[in-house]
């Protein structure tokens, strides 16, 4: 390691210590100095981003997060920093995209999953405040409030219970009660902020100063004697460390300096002095992991657990050892053993960390099991069984076979096409469309996918959408006879339907289509339609633009614009 890199590491460690002490300004200065010495170290920018975010310097935090991603695009923590900064800036949709990008790199990262959930929730709230409030005052959150020490007393007050009941039924009423300190306290608890403690608010312990009575000349008010300040009770001193704890502490310091052999010496000494020092054994296992001595680390954890069982150690300590054991098994790709260890950790102490580990291992086990289940040959066998059932009109049985075929080979687009056809036979048109979409996604040039989707839409009397799907297929294979025939039938059905509708009914039906809504709400398109109605010669100029032509044709097909 170069001299500059060594100095940068020292400044980084100082910055980390300052951050842990919540001295964020000092942390930023340390990371500044470290970056000057080692400007290509992505971790330094990530750490400075976290410090800047804690100081509410959100734009600067975002800049550092982007730099970390630039230097190390395959590092998920860079995306976590970016997501957090974007979230604090109120750019929720961008935060959502950043979290998704990070999860592509590290699909089991619980922090990114939580950040994505927060961003999605905030995005929903930004678009639909009433929906966000409905989520905020859900039954689950009301239960939290009933058991929170700050808010539990409010639920003993009938008027407050009535308020919360009204807001639960109609979240849009929340603004009427925001001035109620009880309600704002509840809101603060749910949002994780102290709403009643604004920038200019007095401390909660401070009481309003009573107005002094005006003294009269005859009877001057005596000056009250100032009470003597009472001394704050002294905190009890921590008990002195045992010799074993001192050795363990020395081991921790050596570990922090990456002096692993020295750390093991101290941890062994700690256990020699106190055979019940489970934490020293657990810490030794951490050192062995760093040294890639995984089997030895497993044995150390098992000995620690045996001792913990013998002395009936604290459940939190046992949970830590089980977690470390699970981490080792995960490194060795022994997922079943890791699952058992993590399960035991949850049983001992169910908290955010142990729960996150369980989710991670369950996801990994499912991925492994799904991959082990893959078989192209077996998929073909199940697919052929499904085709035979389909020919006999046994559509539920056909679907079961196609489902099994997909499990065996989820990348075969033809199976989704077959299942789509079976769903259509059972009048499950939405499921048929979903399978057709998947088929098109996997193989965009497969014409059957467009035929399946268009047929389902036709059956739902969604003629306009069916025409668009057939048109997509014809762009790939312009002379496909089946697509051409289906398009003609759909045009005929659409014409017949529109001829029986009044103008008002036609508009109502067209308004259900989101694309038509968008076209009709476009001020530029409205102006173009006005120009075309007032000056038909202008139509030719406008329709030279392919985008305008496509929108215009959609309005014609929907019967909103009539020609001739």
From Swiss-Prot:
Q: Which keywords fit this entry according to its UniProt record?
A: Cytoplasm, Nucleus, Repeat, TPR repeat
Concerning SUPFAM superfamilies, the annotation shows: TPR-like
Note whether Repeat occurs among the keywords: yes
An annotated Gene Ontology molecular function: Hsp70 protein binding
Q: Does the keyword Repeat apply?
A: yes
Localization (cell): Cytoplasm; Nucleus
Q: Which Pfam families match?
A: STI1-HOP_DP, TPR_1, TPR_12, TPR_8
Question: Can you name this protein?
Answer: Protein STIP1 homolog
Q: Which organism is it from?
A: Dictyostelium discoideum (Social amoeba)
């Amino acid at each position: 390691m170069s001299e500059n890199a060594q100095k940068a590491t020292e400044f980084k460690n100082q910055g980390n210590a300052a951050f842990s002490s919540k001295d964020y300004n000092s942390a930023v200065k340390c990371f500044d100095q470290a970056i000057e010495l080692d400007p290509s170290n992505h971790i330094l920018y990530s750490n400075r981003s976290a410090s800047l975010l804690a100081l509410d310097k959100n734009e600067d935090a975002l800049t550092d997060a982007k730099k970390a991603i630039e230097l190390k695009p395959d590092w998920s923590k860079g995306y976590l920093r970016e997501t957090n900064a974007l979230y604090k800036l109120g750019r929720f949709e961008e935060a959502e995209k950043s979290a998704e990008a990070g999860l592509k790199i590290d699909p089991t990262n619980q922090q990114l999953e939580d950040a994505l959930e927060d961003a999605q929730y905030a995005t929903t709230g930004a678009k639909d405040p009433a929906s966000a409030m409905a989520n905020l005052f859900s039954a689950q959150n009301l239960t939290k409030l009933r058991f929170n020490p700050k808010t539990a007393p409010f639920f003993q007050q009938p008027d407050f219970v009535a308020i919360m009941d009204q807001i639960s039924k109609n979240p849009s009423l929340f603004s009427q009660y925001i001035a109620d300190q009880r309600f704002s306290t509840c809101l603060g608890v749910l949002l994780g902020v102290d709403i009643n403690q604004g920038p200019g608010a007095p401390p909660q312990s401070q009481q309003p100063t009573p107005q002094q009575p005006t003294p009269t000349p005859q009877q001057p008010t005596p000056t009250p004697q100032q009470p003597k300040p009472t001394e704050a009770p002294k905190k009890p001193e921590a008990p002195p460390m045992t010799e074993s704890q001192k050795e363990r502490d020395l081991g921790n310091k050596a570990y922090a300096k990456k002096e692993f052999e020295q750390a093991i010496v101290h941890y062994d000494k700690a256990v020699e002095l106190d055979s019940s020092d489970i934490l020293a054994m657990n810490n030794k296992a951490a050192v062995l992991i760093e040294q890639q001595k995984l089997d030895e680390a497993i044995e150390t954890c098992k000995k620690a657990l045996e001792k913990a069982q013998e002395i009936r150690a604290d459940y939190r300590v046992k949970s830590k050892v089980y977690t470390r054991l699970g981490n080792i098994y995960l490194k060795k790709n022994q997922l079943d053993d890791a699952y058992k260890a993590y399960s035991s950790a949850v049983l001992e102490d169910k908290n955010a960390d142990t729960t996150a580990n369980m989710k991670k291992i369950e996801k990994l086990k499912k991925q492994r099991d799904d991959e082990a289940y893959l078989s192209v040959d077996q998929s073909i066998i199940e697919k052929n069984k499904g085709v035979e059932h389909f020919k006999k009109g046994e559509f539920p049985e056909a679907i079961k076979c196609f489902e099994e075929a997909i499990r065996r080979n989820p990348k075969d687009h033809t199976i989704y096409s077959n299942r789509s056809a079976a769903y259509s036979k059972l009048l499950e048109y939405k499921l048929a469309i979903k399978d057709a979409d998947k088929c098109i996604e996997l193989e965009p040039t497969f014409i059957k996918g467009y035929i399946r989707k268009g047929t389902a839409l036709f059956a739902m009397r969604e003629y306009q959408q069916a025409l668009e799907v057939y048109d997509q297929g014809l762009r790939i294979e312009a002379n496909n006879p089946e697509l051409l025939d289906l398009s003609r039938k759909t045009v005929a059905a659409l014409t017949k339907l529109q001829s029986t509708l009044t103008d008002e009914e036609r508009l109502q039906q067209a308004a259900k289509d989101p694309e038509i809504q968008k076209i009709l709400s476009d001020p530029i398109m409205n102006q173009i339609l006005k120009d075309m109605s007032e000056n038909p010669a202008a139509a030719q100029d406008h329709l030279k633009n392919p985008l305008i032509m496509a929108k215009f044709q959609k309005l014609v097909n929907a019967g909103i614009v009539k020609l001739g």
